[in-house]
């Protein structure tokens, strides 16, 4: 090993000639940043502005279970693609067929009472994603779920609004289809950007609730609470038919979600046409161009006829397409959909030869 020609005094002299560097951070801050730097494999959570420490307590923020996503990732990677998801190859093995029978990206209507649907935003793109979280027991209330989910921490990939359990009291009135929220500490001082994201999260969450209106009460039990730059909230009606289409959204972890469009459409035919070529950023169309030949309706029954050239088969891509169309039909008030001219009579768990009821909500997950 070669010996250095520099002695200690020469090294000190050279170091003394370097420009002075001052670090105004506290020792605690430096330690915190060094600790965070070790977690390079975890993307940082992007919070929604400085006011989030006292953020709105009326938004019911639930946490997605990482265990669920570990289970779901293999089937979700099958849906990855460069263009339309309907180009994904069908798995023909018995094991794959059995897996397809269990694969679904929606909550069936008969299981609606077992889930609570809320919205989260992707930390990288701010895309709004509705997720349906399974209750841990049949009698669990929104308030119970609030306590349970708050103990799990925040996932790196998701943005939620911090909810302070001790600052909010939630009462459910199922018979009146009303949700009452008493806010003990009003939230203020949101930026315009934060207000927009908050509004989207709140609106999407309330849409999937079993309630038709939400009433806001102050700590003194008076009607109305001031929230951000919105002004005073007294009561919010919850529209159930937003007339939107659905697309495939895939985050950086390769997880797939069915997400609604940012804008609404005049007719269901227009909405389905838009699903062939999504103009929405960070989404992929669920339908191959020209795959749908006609869309007709009879009362609350929708009929979708595919073209003979369409690639509609029993695959992950086929399931995503069928369920995306079912959710789109639900947005326009339809209760069931009949599909014709498919390559197969079975796609996933669905018997395509029969009318299919629209689902209750998108993207079911489990908390563990």
Swiss-Prot record:
Its main location: membrane. It is found in: Cell membrane. GO terms for cellular component: plasma membrane. It is a peripheral membrane protein. Disruption phenotype: Insertion mutations in this gene partially restore antibiotic resistance to the beta-lactam antibiotic cefuroxime (CEF) in a sigM deletion mutant. Keywords: Cell membrane, Membrane, Repressor, Transcription, Transcription regulation. Residues 73-101 are annotated as: Disordered. Residues 73-87 have a biased composition (Polar residues). It comes from the Bacteria. The anti-sigma factor for extracytoplasmic function (ECF) sigma factor SigX, inhibits SigX activity and stabilizes it. This is Anti-sigma-X factor RsiX. It comes from Bacillus subtilis (strain 168).
